[in-house]
């Protein structure tokens, strides 16, 4: 009987320790080097045919915003826009844009520049 109590206690402690880091805190986005970017474009929906490419100035603004992230929050959100970053090596990253947040996967940062990126789409719509 003592053996079972010890085994249950050990199992309980191990379970609690192993679950402690289930959701590790991610503090910043992975940095983006603007030299490695082939292009960035924005869409209203994930599978939208209307695509707007970012200018060099817009790319720099976006890269600076992502690289300045200092605190990310884990959240679920329905994006208003999708931003696709295509790199010269073939990799791609997708960011979601809501009213006040920019996110990658489920990690978001609060920003005041979402209107800037939304206006790029609104002012330069073209069909691909």
Outline where the language-model segments fall.
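Sec-dependent bacterial lipoprotein signal peptides
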Residues: 1-21
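Function-determining sites in protein domains
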Residues: 19-128
């Amino acid at each position: 009987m003592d053996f079972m109590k010890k085994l249950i206690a050990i199992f309980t402690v191990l379970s609690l320790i192993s679950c402690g880091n289930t959701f590790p805190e991610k503090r910043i986005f992975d940095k983006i080097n603007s030299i490695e970017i082939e292009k960035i474009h924005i869409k209203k929906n994930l599978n939208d045919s209307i695509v707007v490419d970012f200018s060099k100035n817009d790319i720099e603004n976006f890269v600076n915003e992502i690289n300045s992230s200092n605190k990310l929050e884990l959240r679920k959100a329905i994006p208003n826009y999708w931003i696709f970053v295509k790199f010269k090596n073939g990799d791609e990253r997708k960011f979601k844009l809501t009213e006040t947040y920019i996110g990658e996967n489920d990690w978001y940062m609060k920003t005041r520049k979402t209107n800037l990126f939304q206006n790029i789409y609104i002012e330069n719509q073209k069909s691909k």
